[in-house]
């Protein structure tokens, strides 16, 4: 069927900020879809609130709106643009929920707008638990016994009938939010109560638990002519009971017989046809390992995290084709872009194994609840490709960047057998390493299977890895053992460890015997047809399929898996850098390990290597491709950390040189550089042990800010008040980077701002200064940032620009640089300098219109700012006000304290832009879900050092009609100052303590601060977590509360009696 001519203008809804459960895969899907629709000649309108995405670049759609994804704003845009149709299936759960809301509000009918891709009835049937159950019964598809409940009592009655364990799944929530497995009535009551609150329709599904079954996923496509196919089938290493986003996954399925595969395939195709989905769809099934019995778990009627993985695992561009199907094209008339000859109707065939391992944030959140269940906790994931399962698993392990180069954590060798068995049974994020340790200790795989319900096939592969380790131990320097280990994915580093040698010795031994990896192409058809894609993975076999071209090439290192502190912003910079390299006439090569992102889309670069970002893997690509040089400044800390070793191996690092990177990172060198340049910084010292640190703190005076050098996202950074806390910090935190000393700085409590600059070594372009709303002490990634600055005098802005120029030239920066400043008493201090692209690059590029990463790349390749038509110094300011606001995922992470501080905690960001600060703030708060009602009750519980400041806020809240409530100490202080506040009870005082009031909906907002000492107060944490659970706006920094107040006041009319 040819494409539709009756529609011209299509609106695509994006997925908003990155949160746990909805990450960069939707940027990849949305970007592909917009480009595919433009390619077919449609006018595309995009709405998304997340500036850190490629999808919100001007060239991706005809019109791009970076506005809050709320009914109020989307409705306005629709009325302004009048699209003929809306495509909601590429915006994750956010997109689907928005489509449902627009329909319920009558907007779609009113303006005669059609929904493309998936009909509303299908979204309803897949998402509404009752309708889904009815449909499965009609299709004779088995589902676990279940019931829909609207109260906790109904849940208890049902569970008594069918017996425990049961699973609770709230309707219309994302990433299993609010759900869980309950093995007792007590757990059931707690989880159901929370689940009902989180479900927008106040309903939960209670179902019999099938934990322990194999979890299998099918990624399917269907078009309007009812052609349907399976793109990829995937098998979870972990059995049912752990969210698929938190499971290790292999593609294709590894343990199914042909009969089982066909049975589940038929079920998946039957379901997509019954739902009449036009586009992509993901079906999750549970298979009994001991019979042919299976259950359908759930269906996602949209592009999902699994479809991004399936696209990268097979090379089949699901989102692109889904967008074209939505406008009427069919699978049998679209060419598969990978082969360029076969049609999209061909099911991909794989002659390799793909492994995906999730990346968790527990290196940042040491107190977080690490046990895995039906609620997702991973922030990102890595993928690796190999010719056997062992190879792909080990490559994925070393892609994770958690300090391991193998499926082994050395720290586990000291734990007791008892602890080991507990950790093997109760799955945590690192269970793979505990399982491997158990096998090394001689536990039989049969025993482990009965404890974990993980298939023997997988455990046998882990045993095989251990057998190869033992073989290496017995045959040191043996070439055949080396060859075998390399074939199964062992790294040089691991082999060196076993043979007690240096990694370079193993590399030399490989080279002397011509033992190099070859690169195989990902071609969707198991090499049956010729493919034209430049998409490769390494393996130790004979035939190499990647040929060096005769064009000069440049290698760009990506940023690996998404984690807190290193998000999609770095991928954004990577993609832009590649565009500039191609424009300059070079061949652009990307190396990365993250399946969710735009950078690993094979159509972005001239060549893509899907490989771990380790020294060995990068060097292997360099040996083959012989690029002119490598760019490391766009890949976050991941790429910067490789610069030293690559440079020592003789590789040309383009842009800022390694010794200059070192001058910015190494404390003593940095201090020396600042002194030479005459730039003030907070007084500070380095320390390598406890005595030195105490001595430094004594000299500088408390409070001090302590942190390890060479880290990203404020990892292990703390503000310390006294000697005892400093000792405690050194004993627990310094392990963050063993060979580098820690830094002890005077802590200046002032206004913070940051600058991104681009330098060619002689002149420096400063696109803009971003002023932080929160004062120093809150990590820059967690602060709200305003551009252009609203409260900095012209003189201070000039000083900042001057210092930035001096730094860029003094540190020989070529390309990007980020500088953070703190201002106190009109004095500007430099806190830190990062000679690389930072997380503010996409935001600043969008609001200034300067394609910063592209310009930086051109400078790295030898052009000057003057060549490109840019002046030296601060770029003219934008007339609008733009705000970047952080977005957190605390609802997904139990036991993680939501208090803001110097260690970064946000997972994503949104942007609000308008003609005034108040309007821009309003949009930013709406976009990050901090909607505050116009009146209600607000609770203050404030540390002594900020009570005076809180008082003036409380007075302003009262003036606009809020009722003030406060805890004992705060209420007493307010009363002394003439402001009466309702007293709330102490924690544990069942009737009116804060958590109880919050639970009953009596509180609209909470302002809760702790002293500089930031002691982990149990009560405060309970108050904060109750606010997070119930979705009540919580302010842990007075500056944020002040910003919100500004918005409320601007929307308030003055009402006075005459």
Swiss-Prot record:
The keyword Metal-binding applies. Mn(2+) 2 binds at residues 298, 300. Binds 4 Mg(2+) or Mn(2+) ions per subunit. Coiled coil: none annotated. Mg(2+) 4 binds at residues 832, 834. It comes from the Bacteria. ATP 1 binds at residues 129, 169, 175-176, 208, 210, 215, 241-243, 284, 298. Transmembrane segments: none annotated. Mg(2+) 1 binds at residues 284, 298. This is Carbamoyl phosphate synthase large chain. It comes from Streptococcus pyogenes serotype M1.
């Amino acid at each position: 069927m040819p494409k539709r001519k009756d529609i011209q203008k299509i609106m695509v809804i994006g997925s908003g900020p990155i949160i746990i459960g909805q990450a960069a895969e939707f940027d990849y899907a949305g970007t592909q879809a917009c480009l595919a629709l433009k390619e077919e000649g449609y006018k595309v309108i995009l709405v998304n609130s997340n500036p850190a995405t490629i999808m919100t670049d001007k060239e991706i759609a005809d019109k791009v709106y970076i506005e809050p994804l709320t009914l109020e704003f989307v409705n306005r845009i629709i009325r302004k643009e009048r699209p003929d149709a809306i495509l909601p299936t590429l915006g994750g759960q956010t997109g689907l929920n928005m489509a449902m809301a627009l329909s319920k509000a009558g907007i779609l009918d009113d303006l005669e707008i059609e929904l493309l891709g998936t009909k509303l009835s299908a979204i309803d049937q897949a998402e509404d638990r009752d309708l889904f159950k009815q449909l499965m019964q009609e299709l004779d598809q088995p589902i676990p016994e279940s019931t829909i409940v609207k109260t906790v009592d109904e849940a208890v009655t049902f569970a008594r009938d069918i017996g425990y364990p049961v699973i609770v799944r709230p309707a219309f929530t994302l990433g299993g939010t609010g759900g869980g497995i309950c093995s007792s009535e007590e757990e059931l009551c707690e989880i159901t109560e929370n689940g009902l609150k989180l479900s927008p329709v106040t309903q939960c599904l209670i179902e019999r638990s099938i934990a322990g079954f194999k979890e299998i996923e099918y990624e399917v496509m269907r078009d309007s002519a009812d052609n349907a196919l399976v793109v990829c089938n995937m098998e979870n290493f972990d059995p049912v009971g752990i969210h698929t986003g938190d499971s290790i996954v292999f593609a294709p399925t590894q343990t199914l017989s042909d009969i089982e595969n066909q049975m589940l395939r038929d079920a998946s195709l039957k379901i997509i046809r019954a739902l009449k989905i036009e586009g992509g769809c993901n079906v999750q099934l549970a298979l009994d390992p001991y019979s042919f019995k299976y259950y359908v778990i759930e269906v996602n009627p949209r592009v999902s995290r699994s479809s991004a993985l399936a696209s990268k695992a097979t090379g089949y561009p699901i989102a692109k084709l889904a967008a074209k199907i939505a406008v009427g094209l069919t699978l049998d008339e679209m060419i598969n872009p990978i082969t360029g000859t076969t049609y999209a109707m061909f099911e991909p065939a794989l002659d390799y194994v793909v492994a995906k391992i999730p990346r968790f944030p527990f290196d940042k959140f040491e107190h977080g609840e690490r046990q895995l269940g039906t609620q997702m906790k991973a922030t990102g994931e890595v993928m690796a490709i190999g010719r056997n399962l062992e190879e792909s698993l080990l490559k994925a392990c070393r892609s994770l960047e958690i300090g391991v180069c193998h499926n082994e954590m050395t720290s586990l060798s000291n734990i007791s057998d008892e602890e080991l068995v507990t950790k093997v049974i109760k799955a945590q994020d690192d269970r793979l390493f505990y399982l491997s340790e158990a096998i090394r200790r001689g536990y039989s795989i049969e025993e482990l299977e009965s404890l974990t319900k993980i298939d023997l096939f997988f455990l046998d592969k882990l045993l095989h890895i251990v057998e190869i380790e033992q073989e290496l131990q017995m045959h040191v320097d043996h070439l055949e053992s080396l060859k075998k280990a390399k074939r199964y994915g062992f790294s040089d580093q691991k082999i060196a460890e076993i043979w007690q040698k240096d990694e370079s010795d193993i590399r030399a031994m490989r080279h002397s015997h011509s033992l190099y990896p070859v690169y195989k192409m990902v071609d969707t058809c198991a090499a049956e047809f010729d493919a034209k894609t430049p998409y490769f993975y390494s393996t130790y076999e004979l035939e190499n399929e990647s040929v060096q071209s005769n064009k000069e090439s440049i290698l760009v290192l990506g940023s690996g898996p998404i984690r807190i502190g290193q998000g999609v912003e770095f991928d954004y910079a990577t993609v832009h850098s590649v565009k500039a390299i191609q424009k300059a006439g070079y061949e652009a090569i990307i190396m990365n390990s993250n399946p969710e992102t735009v950078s690993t889309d094979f159509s972005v670069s001239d060549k893509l290597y899907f490989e771990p970002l380790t020294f060995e893997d990068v060097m292997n690509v360099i040996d083959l491709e012989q690029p002119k040089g490598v760019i490391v400044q766009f890949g976050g800390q991941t790429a910067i950390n490789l610069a030293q070793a690559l440079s020592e191996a003789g590789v040309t690092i383009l842009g800022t040189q390694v010794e200059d990177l070192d001058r910015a990172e190494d404390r003593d060198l940095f201090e020396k550089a600042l002194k030479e340049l005459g730039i003030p910084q907070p007084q500070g010292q380095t320390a390598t042990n406890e005595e030195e640190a105490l001595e430094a703190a004594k000299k500088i005076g408390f409070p001090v800010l302590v942190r390890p050098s060479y880290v990203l996202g404020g990892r292990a950074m703390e503000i310390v008040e006294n000697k005892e806390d400093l000792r405690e910090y050194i004993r627990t935190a310094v392990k963050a980077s063993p060979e580098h000393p820690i830094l002890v700085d005077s802590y200046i409590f002032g206004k913070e701002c940051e600058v991104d600059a681009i330098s060619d070594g002689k002149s420096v372009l400063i696109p803009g200064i971003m002023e932080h709303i929160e004062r120093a002490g809150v990590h820059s990634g967690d602060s709200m940032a305003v551009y252009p600055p609203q409260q900095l005098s012209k003189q201070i802005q000039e000083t900042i620009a001057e210092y930035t120029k001096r730094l860029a030239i003094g540190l020989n920066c070529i390309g990007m640089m980020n500088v953070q400043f703190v201002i106190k008493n009109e004095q500007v201090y430099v806190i830190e300098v990062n000679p690389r692209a930072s997380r503010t690059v996409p935001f600043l590029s969008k609001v200034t219109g300067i394609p910063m990463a592209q310009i930086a790349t051109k400078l790295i390749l030898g052009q000057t700012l003057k060549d490109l038509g840019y002046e030296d110094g601060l770029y003219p300011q934008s007339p609008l006000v733009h705000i970047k606001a952080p977005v957190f995922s605390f609802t997904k992470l139990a036991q993680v304290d939501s208090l803001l501080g110097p260690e970064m905690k946000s997972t994503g960001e949104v942007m609000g832009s308008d003609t005034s600060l108040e309007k821009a703030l309003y949009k930013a708060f709406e976009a990050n879900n901090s909607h505050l009602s116009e009146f209600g009750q607000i609770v203050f519980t404030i540390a002594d050092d900020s009570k005076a400041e809180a008082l003036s806020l409380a007075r302003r809240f009262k003036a606009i009609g809020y009722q003030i409530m406060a805890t004992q100490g705060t209420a007493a202080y307010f009363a002394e100052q003439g402001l009466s506040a309702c007293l709330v009870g102490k924690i544990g005082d069942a009737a009116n303590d804060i958590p109880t009031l919050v639970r009953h909906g009596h509180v609209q907002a909470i302002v809760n601060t702790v002293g500089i000492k930031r002691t982990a107060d149990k009560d405060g944490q309970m108050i904060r977590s109750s606010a997070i659970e119930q979705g009540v706006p919580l302010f842990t920094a007075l500056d944020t509360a002040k910003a919100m107040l500004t918005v409320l006041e601007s929307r308030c009319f003055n009402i006075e009696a005459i």
